[in-house]
């Protein structure tokens, strides 16, 4: 192959006349440019490390402090209270340094020490200030004088122009709640779900735990919280994600959809060109820490940015007992899957990032490639979709050497994985339900052998130009991937754009080398394992009952006019819909974040409360008046917001109990209370997809550029998984999953109940269908 020859910098042959050395100037040029690129990235990382390391001060502030100290010394004023004189006396006892030199060195050393002390003081002061969360519990729209003063203090100590990781060392640690508080909150959460006898028994177990075993486990947990950066995150990653032996597909991975209505181009290669380039632009900003940290409360309170570190060049590696996460500092290629074949695509040429048209050129070459897959290659990715133990054993036995190892390394060490899907997906106005359901299922599992589910994310481009993403869950949570995806969709449409003929803008480049086809030698024994994994994955995928739909009746704009939280409104609608669907209440999981703390991830909001149950029962009781229902709605809504705030500020229930359970396992002691708590199924698992970069989309001028959000598979075999995104002011997109094998669930039936519940609750506020249209 021509590209293989181009990759060789020099060749030599031994002849009777000596050694004949032949140099490839093009290859040497590429090696030189690659080296310069690597050193440039190292320098930028070093520079960013220095800037982040001294934040909230700046490197230039060192010069200001030192000059200030030297100026006072010149004016015969001692700002050090004698410290400079002591430094002066200890500097040089041999007499080689002049007195003037010693004065200068002493002043610089003292100034540097003072500068470091100021940095530490500012950083610690900011950490103390950020430990205050009273602002979150204040009445909406009202801010006390104390909170305003606190905000001013935070802004003073926060420095200027923070980079992505600037606040990391200033974020407080996640606090460990008191055992009795957590136990009491737990009992309160399960009271509406248990009969009196069951609740009495659980209360006895809980009280015994809180008095006897709980304090012992708590002591070890507090010890860990003083030592570790976050007492939850490492155990959560290991025991909830990496030690899971079931398939990642459906059970753990989640997806993100493209824009709902718009397809900028129907050319698959062009969509891939712009999409890949946009992702790489985001990586470029991430490498330089140019992505702004997310700030709450009027750009005042920072969220933890640690999860961004492993977004690219990351892969989950299977193990027999536990998986590991492999993360590289850099990767200069991607791997593209098409029709059962794998291609390695270099991302740089002549020392620069490939342009969108050049990436499109690469992708078109792959689409036009007529070669057939090698034996076992077409279904190879099914290994990442099935059980983890067979994949781990197979990887060790058949992918540890030779061409298989080289090709697998190319996949696992790629910046990310790309799938050129052979199907057409997306919203179709003539059949919205079927088209959206098909789109969701394709992104969630595809054909089970055409996504590499171990990669941090797989970028999927469909035949008709629609795109999407499937993400692995262990390295980060959905809002982090959502941040990337918002940037990609915006950059694709508004920054990069397309030519009139649908191609990427710019010209093709005949000098860029062709993609490299990965080579495999897969024996029959390995092919048998692949088939077994594929069968497992197919059974799992075919059992997923998915329903994704846009809710057009109203959005968060009208909900806010009702003076209530949009999230609380939707959560109460979900409770009402579930009760109408099942005729009973269930343990409900709503994902909240704990990124107000360093290395925080998620916490559970137990959305099914006594207050929400009272409201739901009133809604199905024809004897209740609208006034009574509204009163119960407001009580339930306020309770939900309170529970959400507790979860965000480190006073949740489930992560604390989970960590206590882990400690009990390390100590080899059994806790009937913890065992029962952690075995309770979440039959309704919910999550809101946040919009984090609303400035990227001007929905007033471009109302058709609305996001579809994303979703995940059902958590319980007899339950529902519901994801939703509040887009703009007038649209809510829902993604509902369940299993066909459960006789109790039906995603489309639940969707109908949910639409009705949303409308029924809105009707309490006196908004008719006509008034809703006027609001639109």
Curated annotation (Swiss-Prot):
GO terms for molecular function: carnitine O-palmitoyltransferase activity. It is a multi-pass membrane protein. CoA binds at residues 555-567. The modification 3'-nitrotyrosine is found at residues 282, 589. It is an enzyme of class 2 (transferase). Gene3D superfamilies: 6.10.250.1760, Chloramphenicol acetyltransferase-like domain, Choline/Carnitine o-acyltransferase, domain 2. Pathway: Lipid metabolism; fatty acid beta-oxidation. The modification N-acetylalanine is found at residue 2. Residues 74-102 are mitochondrial intermembrane. It is found in: Mitochondrion outer membrane. The modification Phosphoserine is found at residues 741, 747. It comes from the Eukaryota. The modification Phosphothreonine is found at residues 588, 604. Its EC number is 2.3.1.21, 2.3.1.-. Catalyzes the transfer of the acyl group of long-chain fatty acid-CoA conjugates onto carnitine, an essential step for the mitochondrial uptake of long-chain fatty acids and their subsequent beta-oxidation in the mitochondrion. Also possesses a lysine succinyltransferase activity that can regulate enzymatic activity of substrate proteins such as ENO1 and metabolism independent of its classical carnitine O-palmitoyltransferase activity. Plays an important role in hepatic triglyceride metabolism. Homohexamer and homotrimer. Identified in a complex that contains at least CPT1A, ACSL1 and VDAC1. Also identified in complexes with ACSL1 and VDAC2 and VDAC3. Interacts with ZDHHC4. This is Carnitine O-palmitoyltransferase 1, liver isoform. It comes from Equus caballus (Horse).
């Amino acid at each position: 192959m021509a590209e293989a020859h181009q990759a060789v910098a020099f060749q030599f042959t031994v002849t009777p006349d000596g050694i004949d050395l032949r140099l490839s100037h093009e290859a040497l040029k590429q090696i030189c440019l690659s080296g310069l690129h690597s050193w440039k990235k190292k320098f930028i990382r070093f520079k960013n490390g220095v800037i982040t390391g001294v934040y909230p001060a700046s490197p230039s502030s060192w010069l200001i402090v030192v000059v200030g100290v030297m100026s006072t010394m010149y004016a015969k004023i001692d700002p050090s209270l004698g410290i400079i004189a002591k430094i002066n006396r200890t500097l040089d006892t041999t007499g080689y340094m002049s007195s003037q030199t010693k004065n200068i060195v002493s002043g610089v050393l003292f100034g540097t020490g003072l500068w470091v002390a100021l940095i530490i003081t500012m950083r610690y002061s900011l950490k103390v200030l950020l430990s205050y969360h009273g602002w979150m519990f204040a009445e909406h729209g009202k801010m006390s004088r104390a909170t305003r003063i606190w905000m001013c203090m935070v802004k003073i100590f926060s420095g200027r122009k923070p980079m992505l990781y600037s606040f990391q060392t200033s974020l407080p640690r996640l606090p460990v709640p008191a055992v009795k508080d957590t136990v009491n909150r737990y009992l309160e959460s399960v009271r509406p779900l248990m009969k009196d006898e069951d609740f009495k028994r659980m209360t006895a177990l809980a009280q015994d735990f809180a008095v006897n075993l709980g304090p012992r486990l708590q002591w070890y947990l507090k010890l860990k919280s003083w030592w570790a950066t976050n007492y939850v995150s490492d155990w959560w990653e290991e025991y909830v994600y990496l030690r899971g032996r079931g398939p990642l597909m459906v059970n753990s991975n989640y997806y993100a959809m493209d824009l709902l209505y718009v397809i900028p181009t129907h050319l698959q290669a062009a969509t891939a060109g712009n999409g890949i380039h946009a992702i790489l632009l985001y990586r470029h900003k991430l490498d330089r820490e140019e992505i702004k940290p997310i700030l709450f409360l009027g750009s005042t309170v920072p969220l933890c940015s640690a999860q961004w570190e492993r977004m690219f060049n990351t892969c989950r590696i299977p193990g027999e007992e536990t998986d590991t996460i492999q993360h590289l500092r850099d990767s200069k290629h991607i791997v593209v899957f098409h029709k059962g074949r794998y291609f390695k695509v270099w991302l740089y040429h002549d020392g620069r990032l490939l342009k969108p048209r050049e990436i499109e050129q690469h992708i078109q070459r792959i689409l036009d490639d007529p070669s057939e897959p090698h034996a076992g290659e077409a279904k190879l990715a099914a290994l990442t979709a099935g059980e983890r133990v067979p994949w781990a054993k197979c990887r060790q036995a058949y992918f540890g050497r030779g061409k298989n190892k080289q090709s697998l390394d190319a996949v696992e060490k790629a910046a990310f994985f790309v799938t050129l899907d052979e199907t057409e997906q997306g919203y179709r106005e003539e059949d919205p339900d079927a088209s959206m359901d098909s789109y969701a299922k394709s992104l969630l599992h595809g054909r089970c052998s055409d996504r590499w589910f171990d990669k941090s994310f797989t970028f999927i481009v469909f035949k008709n130009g629609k795109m999407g993403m499937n993400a692995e869950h262990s390295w980060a949570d959905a809002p982090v991937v959502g941040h990337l995806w918002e940037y990609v969709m915006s950059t694709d449409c508004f920054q990069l754009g397309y030519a009139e003929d649908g191609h990427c803008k710019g010209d093709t480049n005949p000098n860029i080398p062709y993609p490299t086809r990965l080579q495999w030698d897969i024996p029959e024994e390995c092919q048998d394992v692949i088939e077994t994994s594929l069968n497992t994955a197919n059974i799992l995928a075919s059992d997923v009952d998915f329903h994704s739909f846009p809710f057009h009746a109203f959005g968060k704009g009208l909900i806010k006019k009702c003076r209530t939280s949009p999230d609380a409104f939707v959560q109460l609608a979900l409770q009402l819909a579930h009760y109408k669907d099942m005729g009973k209440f269930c343990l409900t999981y709503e994902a909240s974040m704990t990124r107000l703390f360093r290395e925080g991830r998620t916490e559970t909001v137990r959305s099914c409360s006594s207050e929400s149950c009272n409201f739901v029962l009133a809604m199905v009781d024809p004897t209740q008046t609208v006034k009574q229902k509204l009163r119960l709605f407001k009580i339930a809504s306020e309770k939900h917001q309170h529970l959400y705030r507790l979860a965000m500020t480190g006073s949740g229930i489930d992560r604390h109990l989970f960590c206590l359970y882990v400690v009990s396992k390390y100590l080899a002691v059994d806790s009937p209370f913890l065992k029962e708590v952690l075995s309770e199924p979440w039959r309704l698992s919910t999550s809101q997809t946040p919009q984090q970069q609303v400035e990227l989309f001007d929905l007033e001028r471009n109302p058709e550029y609305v996001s579809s959000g994303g979703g995940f598979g059902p958590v319980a075999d007899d339950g529902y998984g519901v994801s939703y995104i509040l887009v703009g002011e007038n649209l809510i997109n829902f993604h509902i999953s369940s299993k066909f094998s459960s006789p109790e669930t039906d995603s489309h039936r639940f969707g109908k109940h949910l639409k009705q519940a949303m409308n029924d609750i809105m009707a309490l506020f006196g908004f008719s269908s006509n008034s809703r249209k006027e609001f639109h």
